[in-house]
């Protein structure tokens, strides 16, 4: 008789990317980013990105931590729209005055120093996070406004007018900024806008993406697509590039977040090879280092600690940001603040060298995601053809120098506006989604990726991976599983996210039960589990019993995927640090499962027709060996890999000769092939 073996993992069925779901892009847009002209006369639509279904113009919005930007594809080109102050980027700030007026943008930021407790910024650093997240707790100590806990999530408490205290979610604050961008576009286009493409950092998790979409709804916008910021910037760089394939690294360092994406651009196909980043690193952190430095200087020179003085800190923050910007073009500046506190004027020089010293570790930290993305993409430094700088913080000379040194002196490409490139790409995406086509466009394809591995738990707590990190999305993958026990009528599908081999070390996203499975021996039912990630990075899971047709489906919502950037980094870091431990544990589980499967299959044989062909002594011998093995398994749940393998060999030494002899006596009928192989279609992991 053949040796029964543990059911192997079923072949993953890659159903492929549906071309209809892929994003078609223009290959040549006339001109570069155009300055917004004065609003056209009422009723002049201007050939904007119209929906084929009559849904109106679709705009592209870069919702940034510190600044936001809006664009539209119109008259065969992308136009970045200036706000009512004539500026093409708008501060992502919201404030409330004594008279109850709400200010958004420049007006809010300009009065922040005089009204710190009622001026809100950095909502993007709170959105989609948990109140208990380390980043939130750290930021709370630095923000002048009150951040409070509401159902485990951070909210902002602010007095909107005298005596009227309100609590806003980060989604609501972001919605206020989105509303301003929407109104800016409406004033320019002369029509109502209800649809948008909104960008997010590539390393935003599902909860943060869902929360961003919710902010759009609050702002009266249908967010047709969430697009990753570095991918949008790559469109701005490569939309008019033709010729041989190029590997492009997008280095996106903004006010509050940092992303690195590596893309292969080949005649209109934009394929993301890998992405990495830090959703809590950017210009705001560089400003904070300067503030900490000057607080110490003030304490030393004036004997005054302004750390608790929100107004003084507001003035200092404003001047530190100005100094940081100036040092990108000058080697020394002077930070001067009139009447910083108690009528005391402050004046202190700041050199570029000192600025670089204060932020040296943060600048070096940006190289870590670069190295990880390069490794994930499987590329060497010489394989990168272009380095594209995006985000205002990439203007810092030291950041540029570190990147240049890493790539052996290669100069970054400065052909795109770092402040506007993301909104440009979003506007192109909006145009394509709206169905806009003209004589200047050709079909182009964008292939983005999922940032983390997605899978489910199988027998022994093993993380069975269905969608590995950096898999192109949208994607759908199906794998067939089976039951772990006899007459099992319900299976629990537990969905996880992470890089470790055991589910206990990964993040549980959600779980559900598939019931009504027809009672059958262990291993007989076939349950097809399908993971589907849409173009926004949102996951849905379907489980179906092939025999009965019963199915259950869930969409993993933001509530289910409450995962902070710190946890993402921990998952990847621990996966790298404990890879050997993961491998050993997986091998231990595999060895135990192999022994259990062999015991089960021999017991099944003893209960079948082959048992009738056994002689009494043979049957007793096999039954005794199986009983001893079963008892040993029950008494040794934590045995090592070698112990399980040795026990399996001992059992095989007893059972295989008997089964082989019976098989030969029966003329080869009623048994399994001697090599023990079974059809792969019936071989499935157990749930």
Curated annotation (Swiss-Prot):
Keyword Transcription regulation attached: no
Subcellular location: Endoplasmic reticulum
GO CC term, one of those recorded: endoplasmic reticulum chaperone complex
Biased composition regions of type Acidic residues, renumbered to the chain: 676-687
Keyword Iron-sulfur: no
A GO BP entry: endoplasmic reticulum unfolded protein response
Region (Disordered): 662-687
The family this protein is said to belong to: Belongs to the heat shock protein 70 family.
Function, as annotated: Functions as a chaperone during endoplasmic reticulum (ER) stress response.
Protein name: Heat shock 70 kDa protein BIP4
Source organism of this protein record: Oryza sativa subsp. japonica (Rice)
